[in-house]
UniProtKB/Swiss-Prot annotation:
Major place of residence: plastid
Protein name, UniProt field: Large ribosomal subunit protein bL19c
Species this chain originates from: Phaeodactylum tricornutum (strain CCAP 1055/1)
Family matches, as Pfam families: Ribosomal_L19
Cellular component GO terms held in the UniProt record: chloroplast; mitochondrial large ribosomal subunit
Key words of the record: Chloroplast, Plastid, Ribonucleoprotein, Ribosomal protein
Transmembrane regions listed in the UniProt entry: none
NCBIfam families listed in its UniProt record: rplS_bact (TIGR01024)
């Protein structure tokens, strides 16, 4: 009984911080994420583009792992989707995938790492 009440309290608090205007994020999507960066007194938005290779859903703790290739080196970054540091998320392109996690892309290079694009 006590566990049910505490879960309701947790859900009520979390619901205040969940972003409502998020696009539907799927594995294999190419996304552009705007991250707020504070440098001294200035605040700016830095964009990060890449492919979603993993997604973990847990209400407010939802994370996505985004991978991109920069100067021949693979870079992966994990983003908390509902974080106040995330300014915007835009889906640039969707791809057809048959896996829940695309970790196999880590071993592929060049054209082999391309995903088949889907059109809406």
């Amino acid at each position: 009984m006590l566990k049910l009440k505490t879960q309701k309290v947790i859900d009520a608090i979390e619901s205040k911080f969940i972003k409502k205007d998020l696009p539907t994020l799927k594995i294999g999507d190419n996304v552009r994420i705007g991250v707020k960066i504070i440098e001294g007194t200035k605040e700016r938005v830095q964009f990060y583009e890449g492919t979603i290779i993993a997604k973990k859903n847990s209400s407010i703790n939802m994370t996505i792992t985004v991978r991109k290739i920069l100067q021949g080196i693979g870079i992966e970054r994990v983003f908390l989707v509902h974080s106040p540091k995330i300014d915007s998320i835009t889906v640039l392109r969707s791809s057809k995938v048959r896996r829940a996690k695309l970790y196999y892309l880590r071993n592929l290079r060049g054209k082999a790492s391309r995903l088949k694009q889907t059109f809406k």
